[in-house]
């Protein structure tokens, strides 16, 4: 039985890879793509979601735009990583085949969760958590109906938006605090894991060998991404967001530890930090777990297989 997910994202180059993976893997039933301000403005990330849906040949999956700004803070973006469009240097068609759902993303999330059987939908946020927090506040009953939240965000060893805070949590820590403190199960796929998901030359060669238009698109954005990382960070591109989707497909793609997690909201130097408590004894009723180690080969095999299954959509 395919796992039903709602992918709440801010495309974003690595979000695009996550969309390809979710669409191309038969173990996933992609119920919706919802967008939130993050890597770029809401307008730009929504445009990018429609572009990627067109490239991947996604039909019949609603795409809806969500929150334009965090719950209480100002807007920050990551144009220095993803470019001014949020999707590197790709070109855009005069119009998109993929039409926007008329509902706000938060309402679409609520509608889908409330209309499906309880514990059948996994939320996969790969951007800031504003939409998810808003959905919880508008319709608290969704918490008991969601199977799990598997998010890309946070980190227990290092940050990227600050020395200790990861970007997705940093841009809306109040939303993250809401999501992590609800009574649902949360798997945090953070920087400690995603920094292992490198788009190495060997990986890019495998993408090129797929030989389809979606593969060429992915190669183009990964090339842009890698050049930015090589210049700014002296490393290969770190493909964060598809790691969360990969976990839903096959949890053995990474190892996790069940530990308490909370969000720092008031620190002079630590706002947005995901505070992970590895001390023993561990709480028996702990609802949060953090990803630790990635099976690199298994992860990239999932991505390449999804690309091959997508083929060349008409």
UniProtKB/Swiss-Prot annotation:
UniProt cross-references to CDD domains, sorted A to Z: nuc_hydro_IU_UC_XIUA
Q: Where does substrate bind?
A: 14, 160, 166, 168
Q: How is its activity regulated?
A: Is potently inhibited by immucillin A and immucillin ACAP, which are transition state inhibitors.
* Keyword flag Cell inner membrane: no
Q: Specify whether Transferase is a keyword of the entry.
A: no
Q: Where is the active site?
A: 240 (proton donor)
| Required cofactor(s) | Ca(2+)
Kindly list the biological process annotations in GO that this record carries: nucleotide metabolic process; purine-containing compound salvage
**Pathway membership:** Purine metabolism; purine nucleoside salvage
Catalysed reaction equations from the record: inosine + H2O = hypoxanthine + D-ribose; uridine + H2O = D-ribose + uracil
User: What Enzyme Commission number does this protein have?
Assistant: 3.2.2.2, 3.2.2.3
Q: GO molecular function terms here?
A: calcium ion binding; inosine nucleosidase activity; purine nucleosidase activity; uridine nucleosidase activity
Keywords associated with the record: Calcium, Glycosidase, Hydrolase, Metal-binding, Nucleotide metabolism
Where do transmembrane segments lie in this chain? none
Which Pfam families would you find in this protein's record? IU_nuc_hydro (PF01156)
Task: Report the superkingdom from the record.
Answer: Eukaryota
Instruction: Give me the residues that bind Ca(2+), please.
Output: 10, 15, 126, 241
PROSITE patterns on file: IUNH (PS01247)
How is the subunit organization of this protein annotated in UniProt?
Homotetramer.
Family as reported in the entry's similarity comment: Belongs to the IUNH family.
- Outline what the protein does: Catalyzes the hydrolysis of the N-glycosidic bond of all of the commonly occurring purine and pyrimidine nucleosides into ribose and the associated base, but has a preference for inosine and uridine as substrates. Likely functions in purine salvage from the host, a fundamental pathway since protozoan parasites such as L.major are incapable of de novo purine biosynthesis.
Q: What is this protein called?
A: Inosine-uridine preferring nucleoside hydrolase
This protein's species is: Leishmania major
Its lineage opens with: Eukaryota, Discoba, Euglenozoa, Kinetoplastea, Metakinetoplastina
